[in-house]
């Protein structure tokens, strides 16, 4: 049987000879479908229900086969609302898994789980599609070299460097700058690495998805005039969608990222916001399919589902997918099975701090809480490792002295501690940086700081060479030369005022 892609239902191929079944049971988003003997669809096949509801409205629902029940029946999970479906309706077996558009045509566009554009900008070129279910790259295809993925953001590159082809957890509450950090990373990978990004919105608020899209257009990450010049493709399966869509939208985004890596041989950034919602959707589907729940009501297949997704995110000889995943921690309980399973896959964590955001230090990355497995002398080199450790020690000592300063004041500290505090405050400010994507809001041009420049700057602060400069000279600058130039300007300004 020949498969010919169709444009009627993006993301699904139809067969010239249709294999028809009928709905025998509907329980929420789960359908049981009876097929003729010997015509059973395979697991993960896409089924399409077309017809009219009782009000005469056209229905077009795509489902994915999850279980073969026996007696020629299969159980499938719907990718959209099942309102209006009735028993006895015809179901078409497409004979293949869900497939979505991939390649340059996806840039600057917003898709749903089926690969259908939802941004009202017309159809997408569906000549190149790819199934969302694939096996992870084989061992021989993997690139095992440990290399740093330079982001151009000082605090990240120095204290919690990302691994090329690694997975990073992004922790932070509302309003501490997650979105701006994400957009800056998208911008920097495009400029410094010639790479592209894919953003998977998994089970988050529709408003946030809309805000992100608008901000991307405003900051130039998405180019409305010429979509091909955009740096990102967006895939959304929001909170209000059925669990099937939320469970699979991460795979849709990953499939688009894999094409850029394997065929275009690019470095790709894959954002998943939020990985917890992927687990949550899997838990809902698992219960609907009648599986026995495991700890805290999660699905028994939790580790398998997480592993299947995460193992496809890796570096191969062709290119890399570096993934940044926002992690929601339910009730701040890090031992909850969902975040605990996620942590096992992470190479680095970037923790955003409300305290730093309140001080106006952006990016508000917590230098002491953020960690990385890459921060080892044999990987990053002795100079980088030593500088990072000394920066952390200085900041840690400053934290310990905060209580004494609050009660007794700075004058009660020893000479050595006062020097530590002065340097720590300079370091804290030097960890801030103007972003390219924030130019439109702040008016100050963004800065990309290379790793060597970052290390040089912090070494100079730690050595005491810059002790005479005022701490505000280090705030929102790029490299250390800009800080010294800013100090000279501040000095001249103060003289003029006098």
From Swiss-Prot:
A GO molecular function held by the record: ATP hydrolysis activity
Keyword Thylakoid: yes
Topological category with respect to the lipid bilayer: Peripheral membrane protein
Main subcellular location of this protein, as a coarse class: plastid
Class in the EC hierarchy, top level: translocase
Entries under InterPro entries matching the protein: AAA+_ATPase, ATP-synt_VA_C, ATP_synth_F1_bsu, ATPase_a/bsu_AS, ATPase_alpha/beta_chains, ATPase_F1/V1/A1_a/bsu_N, ATPase_F1/V1/A1_a/bsu_N_sf, ATPase_F1/V1/A1_a/bsu_nucl-bd
GO biological process, one term: proton motive force-driven mitochondrial ATP synthesis
Entry keywords, A to Z: ATP synthesis, ATP-binding, CF(1), Chloroplast, Hydrogen ion transport, Ion transport, Membrane, Nucleotide-binding, Plastid, Thylakoid, Translocase, Transport
PROSITE patterns in alphabetical order: ATPASE_ALPHA_BETA
Catalysis: reaction(s): ATP + H2O + 4 H(+)(in) = ADP + phosphate + 5 H(+)(out)
Binding site for ATP: 172-179
Function (record text): Produces ATP from ADP in the presence of a proton gradient across the membrane. The catalytic sites are hosted primarily by the beta subunits.
Family: Belongs to the ATPase alpha/beta chains family.
Assembly and binders: F-type ATPases have 2 components, CF(1) - the catalytic core - and CF(0) - the membrane proton channel. CF(1) has five subunits: alpha(3), beta(3), gamma(1), delta(1), epsilon(1). CF(0) has four main subunits: a(1), b(1), b'(1) and c(9-12).
Protein name: ATP synthase subunit beta, chloroplastic
Natural source organism: Gossypium barbadense (Sea Island cotton)
Higher taxonomy: Eukaryota, Viridiplantae, Streptophyta, Embryophyta, Tracheophyta
Gene name in the database record: atpB
